[in-house]
């Protein structure tokens, strides 16, 4: 029995595979009819219907026909299915074409949790997913169980197991800064149960900063910059149209504004319960950029996570939850 942790986000898909192997790729895919080549050689082309419909995914999928998941953790969505197939393909599970029994740990935001879990189990549990690779090789994944946890709980469980946070009186607030949204999950640190009335989703994410930077670069160069290039330009300068654009000096004010909006909304939603917060836990890719600012919400409570774990915290927790369920 193989166990994987899977976090299908609107921005990126994260996987914890065999022997703890970590994989991350942009959550986008596109149908293709021909073989493609890049600088590094042949671009991976997969199929889930015996080769009739082929698709490319991740950084290789670009252009007007790309498809993305409908939201974080929407595993039952037809737009997420190729991403699940790609994640399992890259997870390090190899076989001779016969089905490999698999348990998937995953999650979805608390607000739609029950609905999404029911749909995901109906779509995936006790199903055999057959994936055909670029050389015609076939791998079959028999999904025997799907273990779901609310987004943010996975990260908290992982940190608890690592000894980074402790069970104690008070609240832990997991702030997951994603592409479209910032999901805030408040957990009672004594029993690790979500506090529903203090958990919420903000329609603010790193995508807002990327769009703002993209507009700024377009004004400077006269050309519309691709989304993935603008995303890269948030953290360091990049070359675009033979000109160096972006970088911290340009993106700094934009990220400051993003952090201010998130902090203001979190304070508003937590209302008079801020004094009970003992751990602020930023996770997600956006936390690499603005996570340190969140200490302003409750000074002295910020939990520092290794930068390499920030994006994978939920997936690590999902995998741990799946292992514990066996």
UniProtKB/Swiss-Prot annotation:
Gene3D superfamilies named among the record's database cross-references: 3.30.420.40
InterPro entries from the UniProt entry: ALP_N, ATPase_NBD, MreB-like_C
Temperature dependence: Optimum temperature is 50-56 degrees Celsius for the polymerization reaction.
UniProt keyword list: ATP-binding, Nucleotide-binding
SUPFAM superfamilies documented for this protein: Actin-like ATPase domain (SSF53067)
Binding site residues for ATP: 10-14, 179, 231, 285-288, 311
Domain of life: Archaea
Any one GO molecular function term: ATP binding
The UniProt record lists the keyword ATP-binding: yes
Activity versus pH, per record: Optimum pH is 4.5-5.5 for the polymerization reaction.
Pfam family, one: MreB-like_C
Record flagged with keyword Thylakoid: no
Remaining remarks: Mg(2+) is required for polymerization. 4 mM MgCl(2) is sufficient to enhance the polymerization; however, higher concentrations of MgCl(2) suppresses polymerization. Polymerization is also suppressed by addition of NaCl, KCl or CaCl(2), with half suppression by about 100 mM, 10 mM and 18 mM, respectively.
Known function: Polymerizes into bundles of filaments, forming a helix with a filament width of 5.5 nm and an axial repeating unit of 5.5 nm. Polymerization of Ta0583 requires NTP and is optimal with ATP, but GTP, UTP, CTP, and even the deoxy form of NTP can also support the polymerization reaction. Nucleoside diphosphate or AMP-PNP does not support polymerization.
Family: Belongs to the thermophilic archaeal actin family.
Protein name as it appears in the record: Archaeal actin homolog
């Amino acid at each position: 029995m193989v166990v994987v942790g899977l976090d299908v986000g609107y921005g990126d898909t994260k996987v914890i595979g065999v022997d703890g192997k970590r994989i991350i790729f942009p959550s986008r895919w596109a149908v293709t009819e021909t073989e493609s080549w890049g600088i590094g050689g042949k671009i991976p082309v997969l199929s889930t219907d015996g080769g009739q419909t082929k698709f490319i995914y991740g950084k290789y999928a670009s252009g007007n026909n790309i498809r993305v998941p409908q939201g974080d953790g929407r595993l039952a969505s037809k737009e997420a299915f190729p991403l699940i197939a790609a994640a399992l393909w890259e997870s390090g599970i190899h076989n001779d074409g016969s089905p490999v029994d698999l348990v998937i740990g995953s999650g979805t935001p608390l607000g739609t949790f029950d609905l999404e879990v029911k749909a995901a189990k109906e779509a995936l549990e006790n199903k055999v997913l057959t994936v055909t690779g670029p050389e015609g090789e076939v791998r079959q994944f028999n999904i025997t169980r799907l273990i779901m946890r609310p987004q943010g709980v996975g990260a908290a469980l992982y940190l608890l197991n690592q000894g980074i946070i402790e069970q104690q009186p008070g609240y832990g607030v997991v702030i997951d800064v994603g592409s479209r949204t910032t999901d805030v999950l408040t957990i009672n640190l004594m029993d690790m149960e979500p506090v529903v009335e203090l958990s919420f989703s903000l329609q603010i994410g790193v995508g807002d900063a990327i769009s703002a930077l993209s507009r700024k670069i377009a004004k400077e160069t006269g050309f519309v910059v691709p989304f993935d290039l603008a995303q890269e330009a948030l953290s360091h300068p990049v070359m675009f149209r033979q000109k160096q654009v972006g970088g911290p000096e340009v993106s700094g004010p934009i990220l400051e504004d993003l952090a201010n909006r998130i902090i203001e909304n979190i304070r508003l939603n937590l209302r008079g319960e801020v004094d009970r917060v003992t751990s602020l836990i930023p996770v997600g890719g956006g936390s690499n950029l603005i996570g340190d600012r969140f200490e302003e919400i409750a000074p002295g409570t910020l939990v520092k996570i290794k930068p390499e774990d920030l994006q994978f915290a939920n997936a690590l927790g999902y995998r741990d939850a799946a292992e514990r369920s066996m």
